[in-house]
Curated annotation (Swiss-Prot):
The 4 large subunits of the cytochrome b6-f complex are cytochrome b6, subunit IV (17 kDa polypeptide, PetD), cytochrome f and the Rieske protein, while the 4 small subunits are PetG, PetL, PetM and PetN. The complex functions as a dimer. It is a single-pass membrane protein. It comes from Cyanophora paradoxa. The keyword Protein biosynthesis does not apply. This is Cytochrome b6-f complex subunit 6. One of its GO terms (molecular function) is electron transporter, transferring electrons within cytochrome b6/f complex of photosystem II activity. InterPro entries: Cyt_b6/f_cplx_su6.
Amino acid sequence: MVEYLVILSGMFGLALACFFGLRSIKLI
């Protein structure tokens, strides 16, 4: 169960990083 939460939080973090990365690229 703990491993599942770690993987889930990791995927969520990557999604947020990609989302904000694309937004910053569009702003520039």
